[in-house]
């Protein structure tokens, strides 16, 4: 495809777009539903209700939060998917939303050009981040593929950086089926995670219970060619 993700954001080629508005999120902590080990990562899934919404920025419709997940790597210095001027980050958070203004459900929107919007946040190894603790504490309940556990009363906007300056471009899911249906909003500022916290991601297993243990050491896709696309900056 010609619109694959992730990409390397080259600041010298980014276009500052004065028409880009800030984006806003409003998440209902009670909408958080469950945490599940999907074999290549874990997802925190949200109830399908209109309580948790992303709007503004480059988007012309309201987008509803479906789930969030992380990408990480074998080492602390490279676990992100997107890179900035070639610089890598320790991990990357993806908050996945679907276009509820236009489509009836996420299954219908996942293959549409304007179907999904993903907010990405870089994590940089450093201080332990107490805001990640509730998520990390839940991982022991979903050690193996297919396991799920209740996970509620959590507002993922607490994981966003203080500044919501962002880059945006048209791209794809970074895991099969790789649909080219994503408007990406990538926060310029990162949040912190400690080396010990990162290690907890890698302790998750990609195998089902009772099978030989295979840890999920990395699940980050390398940057893909831009192929003529423009990355715009809100700042």
Curated annotation (Swiss-Prot):
Describe regulators of its activity.
Inhibited by acetazolamide.
What does this protein need as cofactor? Answer: Zn(2+)
| Catalytic activity field | hydrogencarbonate + H(+) = CO2 + H2O; urea = cyanamide + H2O
The EC number(s) attached to this protein equal 4.2.1.1, 4.2.1.69
Q: Which Pfam families match?
A: Carb_anhydrase (PF00194)
Q: List, for all copies, the residue spans of the domain called Alpha-carbonic anhydrase.
A: 1-235
Active site positions, chain numbering: 40 (proton donor/acceptor)
List the SUPFAM superfamilies hit by this protein, alphabetically.
Carbonic anhydrase (SSF51069)
Keywords (alphabetical) are: Cytoplasm, Lyase, Metal-binding, Zinc
Q: Its GO CC terms?
A: cytoplasm
Detail which positions bind substrate.
174-175
Q: Which subcellular locations apply to this protein?
A: Cytoplasm
Q: Which GO terms describe its molecular function?
A: carbonate dehydratase activity; cyanamide hydratase activity; zinc ion binding
Matches recorded under InterPro entries: CA_dom, CA_dom_sf, Carbonic_anhydrase_a-class, Carbonic_anhydrase_a-class_CS
Summarizing the function annotation, the protein's role is:
Catalyzes the reversible hydration of carbon dioxide. Can hydrate cyanamide to urea.
Name recorded for this polypeptide: Carbonic anhydrase 1
């Amino acid at each position: 495809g010609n619109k694959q993700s992730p990409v390397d954001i080259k600041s010298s080629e980014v276009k500052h777009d004065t028409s880009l508005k800030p984006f806003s999120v409003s998440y209902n902590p009670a909408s958080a539903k469950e945490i599940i080990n999907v074999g290549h990562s874990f997802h925190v899934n949200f109830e399908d209700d209109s309580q948790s919404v992303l709007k503004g920025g480059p988007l012309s419709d309201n987008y509803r939060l479906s789930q969030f997940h992380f990408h990480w790597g074998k080492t602390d210095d490279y676990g992100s998917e997107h890179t900035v001027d070639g610089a890598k980050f320790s991990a990357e958070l993806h908050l996945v939303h679907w276009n509820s203004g236009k489509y009836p459900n996420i299954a219908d929107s996942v293959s549409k050009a304007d179907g999904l919007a993903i907010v990405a946040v870089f994590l940089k190894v450093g201080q332990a981040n107490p805001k990640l603790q509730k998520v990390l504490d839940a991982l022991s309940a979903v050690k193996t593929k297919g396991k799920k556990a209740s996970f509620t009363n959590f507002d993922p906007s607490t994981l966003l950086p203080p500044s919501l300056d962002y880059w945006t471009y048209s791209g794809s899911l970074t895991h099969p089926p790789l649909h080219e249906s994503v408007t990406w909003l990538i926060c310029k500022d990162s949040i912190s995670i400690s080396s010990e916290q990162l290690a907890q991601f890698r302790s998750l297993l990609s195998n089902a219970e009772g099978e030989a243990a295979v840890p999920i050491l990395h699940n980050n896709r390398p940057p893909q060619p831009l192929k003529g696309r423009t990355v715009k900056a809100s700042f």
